[in-house]
From Swiss-Prot:
SMART domains for the chain: SANT (SM00717)
Protein name: Protein RADIALIS-like 4
Alphabetical UniProt keywords: Nucleus, Transcription, Transcription regulation
Localization terms from the record: Nucleus
Database matches in CDD domains: SANT
Keyword presence, Membrane: no
Cited function: Probable transcription factor.
Length: 77
């Protein structure tokens, strides 16, 4: 999930889930994609949805480039 530290609005866990489901439903070739995603989330503007997506992409790129260490999970054995 995208960090909200630079976002102009806060996102609830429910809104994040709706956002993720809408991204899966409306791919990059969908006409009026961002408007449809904003409607699916509800309470967010098209610009807020685009910004949230940009933050998500940046987070994914940071993780994939190794900027964040992999979590160390406790062994349960």
């Amino acid at each position: 999930m995208a960090s909200s530290s630079m976002s102009t609005s806060s996102w609830t866990a429910r809104e994040d889930k709706q956002f993720e489901m809408a991204l899966a439903k409306f791919d990059k070739d969908t006409p009026d994609r961002w408007q449809k995603i904003a409607r699916a989330v509800g309470g967010k503007s098209t610009e807020e949805v685009k910004r949230h997506y940009e933050l998500l992409l940046r987070d994914v790129n940071d993780i994939e480039s190794g900027r964040y260490p992999q979590p160390r999970y406790r062994n349960t054995n």
